[in-house]
Amino acid sequence: MTTSVCLLGASGSVGESTLKVLRAYPEKFRLHSFSVHSNLEKAKEIQKEFSPDFICVSSDFADVGVLGNKLGRTQILYGESSLCELVREPEVEIVITAIVGSVGLRPTIAAITAGKRLGIANKETLVTSGPLIQSLIAKHNTKVVPVDSEHNALFQLLESLNPNSVEKIILTASGGAFRDLPVEQLSSVTKEQALHHPTWNMGPKITIDSNGMINKGLEVIEAHFLFNVPYDKIGVVIHPQSIAHGIVELKDGASFLYASYPDMIFPIAHSLFHPEPVPKVLRSYPAKDWGKLEFREPDFKRYPGLGLAFEAGKVGGTAPCIFNAANEAAVELFLKDEIRFIEIPDYIRKTLDEIKIEFPLSLEEYEEADRIARETVRNLKARKVVSAC
């Protein structure tokens, strides 16, 4: 008996890694459905190989004529609203949310309320509306297993430890492409440089986030909500080798770390198989091959966005939502060559300063905070407030 999987974001890096895992275990999992944003050629390739029941093309600007309404036995859906339809399909048992950005919020909620097992790779969902998501997970008794490598590592460690013994959780970070660049040279970083990452092959938005360690800031906020750990018990260390993915410090002074080859197939396979063990070796990486492992504190002058994430998380309410939306809007401006790399955290800071923090109860209130934050970034750009600083 195979388990039916719905994969949201099949054409991205996490989506491609998920497909690798499905290929490795055809007797265990079946791709029931998947989504792409606008990569129709990729959609056709995946459909030909996996023959799913449904495909969702979420972009409102997709050329419907390329795929039509049916491809072989596969039904084609269009638009962001169809993402929710996809995850609610009765046959779907596991939903992997690999969509980048706050667009993943509503389909994630749909999966939770429909009682699906959730492999969550869309960190923005918990960042933007953590308290709401927490309450829905508890209400619907939803099983959630994180897919991000760091959170999955911590999940596995914490599951095996007595919670009363835990002192602190540590997220590791490569430090990005500019970890050794003199700080004064960050002002001249180009888009081409910022789109390169030393460890992971990711999409443009996540690569930009990672090179400024804003991605790690988002992960700090996500870890707070996933594991119910206060911010003063969450740490970040630079680990250039990207072999240790998570560390748990114990009250007695000992530490446990989770190590593997830096490949997303490990956390994805764990998420799909949980609570059962993954039955075969995915990629052996014995300790004798690790070489030297380095760990160091992050420099918040080099990575101001990381510090802003901790601040926003501690404030709570809509502050993390504003942080995320302002970052998405600023990264979009950077990718259009309208602002500099080092100005991204400045736009986030200014946006947080300009918007009143609320403590909402509904999804619509969080979405309104998201909208206002994006609009504020555009207004700041038009007024040249940040550039003038």
From Swiss-Prot:
Pathway: Isoprenoid biosynthesis; isopentenyl diphosphate biosynthesis via DXP pathway; isopentenyl diphosphate from 1-deoxy-D-xylulose 5-phosphate: step 1/6
Positions contributing to 1-deoxy-D-xylulose 5-phosphate binding: K123, S149, E150, S174, H197, S210, N215, K216, E219
E.C. numbers: 1.1.1.267
This protein's record includes keyword Metal-binding: yes
Reported cofactor(s): Mg(2+); Mn(2+)
Cysteine pairings via disulfide bonds: none
Function: Catalyzes the NADPH-dependent rearrangement and reduction of 1-deoxy-D-xylulose-5-phosphate (DXP) to 2-C-methyl-D-erythritol 4-phosphate (MEP).
Annotated family: Belongs to the DXR family.
Protein's name according to its UniProt entry: 1-deoxy-D-xylulose 5-phosphate reductoisomerase
Taxonomic source organism: Leptospira interrogans serogroup Icterohaemorrhagiae serovar copenhageni (strain Fiocruz L1-130)
